[in-house]
């Protein structure tokens, strides 16, 4: 296996908060020929991430605000689904934030931003959004995780296998479609509704 470390920072709010998960993976043996072992970080460093993943668009905005992305290095995978904030809901008129501004910032501040409605894909598969996110991560090719190995891990869990595999497949295919659509002339990204939390990964 490969050396890997995962940590999480729980969100803090009056009732709830988004938890940020951080993962570092070294695509090399645990100990090199000179006997040196890797030393991993416990939390993400701004501008030092290869991959940032978010299951809700406003969480993507928070990652952008924190300066986690680098326009020469970071690939962003984000759902365009939304969980409206209290500030948005309490407006008498349409108080929703301008999602186009977030999407444009995501494109400008990352090496590549792949955005699509993963919450809708999760609902269609009858599963949770994490399965769809897993498929999108696998499709990115940034981590040494072949699709077959990812699907074998899902089967090995023994819980909600059919639904999770369906969500994984939708995430994988959705990433490919969104990447192709983004590269086509005169096309952009769409928006939708949904809920979720933010996540980050670095290598």
What is the predicted function of each stretch?
Residues 1-190, 195-203:
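Active-site cofactor/cluster-binding pocket
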């Amino acid at each position: 296996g490969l050396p890997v470390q995962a940590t999480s920072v729980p969100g803090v709010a009056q009732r709830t908060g988004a938890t940020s998960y951080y993962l570092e993976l070294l695509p090399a043996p645990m100990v090199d020929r000179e006997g040196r072992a890797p030393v991993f970080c416990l939390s993400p460093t701004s501008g030092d991430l290869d991959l940032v993943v978010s299951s809700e668009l406003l969480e993507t905005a928070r990652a952008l605000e924190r300066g986690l992305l680098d326009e020469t290095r970071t690939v962003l995978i984000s759902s365009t689904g939304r969980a409206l904030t209290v500030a948005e809901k309490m407006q008498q008129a349409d108080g929703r934030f301008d999602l186009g501004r977030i999407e444009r910032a995501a494109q400008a501040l990352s090496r590549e931003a792949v955005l699509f409605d993963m919450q809708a894909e999760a609902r269609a598969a009858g599963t949770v959004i994490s399965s769809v996110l897993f498929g999108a991560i696998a499709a990115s090719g940034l981590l040494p995780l072949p699709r077959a190995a990812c699907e074998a891990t899902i089967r090995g869990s023994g819980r909600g296998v059919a639904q999770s595999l369906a969500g994984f497949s939708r995430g994988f295919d959705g990433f490919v479609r969104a990447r192709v659509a983004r590269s086509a002339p005169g096309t952009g990204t769409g928006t939708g509704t949904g809920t979720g939390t933010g996540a980050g990964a670095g290598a």
